[in-house]
């Protein structure tokens, strides 16, 4: 957030307005959490008309689905809020827009966007579900995170440049996802009636109000960046990729087609 240079009274006013908006988003989140507990089934649904994924990705997804039961209940409660948002939008024939947000839009938010779209296709519910990602600032989709999704089985085309617009696909003939770093309010992202999914605690703390969001759900992940340049780099990125994949698949498994 930009610091006010107009004095303490203006700063206080801005803070008050932000707090009120933040309260509204939190209250909306709490209401949806109660509804999620009542309306979302515990048993994940089976894919009805899943897309034929690339072979290596399909094998990877089998292990992802097998891991869903191990997600802690507290975490599932948060994920169900997102599932209910998607379910409600689909039942109303409205687009279900999911925007995944972290500080630099370089690792966790991209993985979340990609895996959410892939999970929706796997369960045959992708129509009307739109996934986006953004940061509080723009950098680039980190090459280490790109390498992790490639190891999972995605096909990725890199056009080059300082902030490449990667083309990511999960199946032949499926729409390619264009992934590049941008701010969460980029013109290409949804600007209203979306769920703001906060994938890092720093962005959740520093940006307490997301304009246009009808729901805000924090599901922070540990930043794999902490392993950059170490012997644990590949293992850490793969672990985070698998965790995010498992939770995105859990979300979509809770949505009835």
Located regions from the model:
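Post-signal peptide N-terminal segment of mature Sec-exported envelope proteins
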Residues: 26-49
């Amino acid at each position: 957030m930009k610091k006010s240079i107009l004095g303490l009274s203006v700063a206080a006013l801005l803070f008050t307005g932000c707090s009120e908006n933040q309260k509204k988003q939190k209250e909306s989140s709490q209401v949806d959490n109660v509804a999620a507990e009542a309306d979302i089934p515990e048993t994940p649904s089976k894919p009805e008309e899943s897309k034929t994924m690339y072979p290596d990705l399909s094998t990877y997804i089998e292990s992802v689905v097998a891991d869903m039961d191990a997600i802690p209940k507290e975490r599932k409660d948060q994920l169900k809020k997102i599932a209910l948002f998607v379910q409600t939008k689909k039942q109303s024939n409205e687009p279900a827009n999911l925007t995944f947000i972290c500080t630099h839009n370089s690792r966790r938010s991209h993985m979340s966007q990609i895996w959410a779209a892939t999970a929706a296709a796997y369960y045959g519910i992708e129509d009307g579900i739109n996934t986006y990602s953004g940061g509080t600032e723009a950098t680039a989709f980190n090459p280490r995170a790109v390498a992790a999704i490639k190891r999972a089985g995605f096909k990725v085309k890199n056009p080059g440049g300082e902030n490449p617009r990667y083309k990511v696909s999960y199946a032949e003939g499926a729409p390619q996802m264009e992934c590049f770093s941008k701010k969460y309010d980029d013109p290409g992202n949804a600007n209203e009636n979306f769920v703001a999914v906060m994938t890092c605690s720093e962005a959740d703390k520093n940006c307490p109000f997301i304009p246009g969001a009808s729901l805000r759900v924090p599901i922070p992940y540990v930043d794999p960046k902490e392993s950059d340049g170490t012997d644990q780099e590949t293992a850490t990125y793969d672990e985070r990729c698998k965790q995010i994949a498992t939770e995105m698949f859990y979300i979509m498994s809770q949505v009835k087609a």
